[in-house]
Amino acid sequence: DGVHTEGQDYLLYYHRAHRLEEYLNLIKETKAQCTIPVIASINCYRLTEWTDFAKQIEEAGADALELNIMSICSELDYEYGAYERLHIDIVKQVKKSVSIPVVVKLGKNLTNPIPLINQLYAHGVAGVVLFNRMVTPDINLDKMSYIAGDVFSHPSDLYESIRWIGLASDRVP
């Protein structure tokens, strides 16, 4: 019915907190069993959530943190450039709250990632990952419904990343 209740907020909070606790335990267990660096990854969609999660992940023992900043905005009134500014704002906030290296994974939905990559480095990121692999839907024509697309990567998935890595390699510090 479109109504959002306090009960729904509680359930969402409880579910997220439980999943985060599982993830933090996984980091702790991995650190206890491995001698190689552990790079944790988080994907949030609100600016405020990143810093809380990042600090907890650092405290769990992660050696570095990947920020998977991927969302698709289809709003007509979304201001041009706001998506890129969100990346910078998230990096600034996270860098204030952790001392471990921070890496940013970008989505493919950028017109020109090179200026953003330069700005991310200027704000102290240790690296950039090109690109996030998007979940692809498909359509079941017999049932006329959406279904999950291919979940596995293919060699052709690399071409766009390789192109942008080549273009950025001599333009990014």
Residue ranges and their predicted role:
Residues 1-6, 18-28, 32-39, 43-173:
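Alpha/beta enzyme core
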Residues 8-16:
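Acidic/glycine-enriched edge-of-secondary-structure segments
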